[in-house]
Amino acid sequence: MGYQKIKIPADGDKITVNSDLSLNVPNHPIVPYLEGDGIGVDITPVMKKVVNSAIERAYGTKRSISWMEVFAGEKATKVYGPDQWLPEETLNAFREFSVGI
């Protein structure tokens, strides 16, 4: 699926869902994230750093997350235009990549 505003990382793979609803998680999954409004701009970079550090500590270089920003709220209106608080593109990305923050 192509996206107009969302940039898919080149160095990762999708998490997929099996018919029994279990997950196939690759070593380098792409995880969509919303920065959010309010304190999101302050806590999102720290959250990513903490998660990245925990993964590195547990798995070394064998596993990592490729973060993919998707948009909602005020930031979405700046990227997509007025009244685009939750763009369809964001919903599609969460559907396609199965897991997000």
Regions found by a protein language model. Give the residues of each.
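Metallocofactor- and cofactor-centric catalytic cores in central/energy metabolism, strongly enriched
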Residues: 1-101
